[in-house]
Amino acid sequence: MENRENTVEVVYGDITRRNNIETLDSYEKAVKKNAWKNEMYRSYYSFPKEFKDYVDENESVKQYNGSIYLDYIYIDIDKGDIDDISFQGYVMDCVSQLFDKGIMAEDINVWFSGNGYHLKLKNVFGLQPSKELNTKL
């Protein structure tokens, strides 16, 4: 379950500008303000608010060994060499298969991004926070 006090690592512009830690709320406000102006990236996982203290003290996210959370599951589907119509059909089939597994439409967000589509799923599989979550996916 999503905790709005959780933090994420955010990169603004150049991918080497790491170690910026923000709450999910701050990150989402920044996306609304900057997304069309500058490149932005965020960590796949979110972290408890103590993660910011760790990064401030160590000046890096490296070797963080606390719990990690999964607020969303992102699936990146690249187009490759197939034609547009076939690719759209493939993506629709992928989404239909998710529906067949019992995932509800309100739990999925789909958008196009130049080379393909992104699917953003809520944590519909109930993955729990843990230190080992990244090894389970």
Pin down the residues of each PLM region.
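Catalytic micro-motifs at enzyme active sites that drive phosphoryl/nucleotidyl and oxygen chemistry
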Residues: 58-65, 95-112
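Histidine-centered divalent-metal-coordination microenvironment in nucleic-acid enzymes
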Residues: 72-75, 102-130
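DNA replication initiation on ssDNA origins
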Residues: 1-72, 77-90, 128, 135
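Long, well-ordered alpha-helical scaffolding segments within enzyme catalytic domains
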Residues: 86-105, 131-137
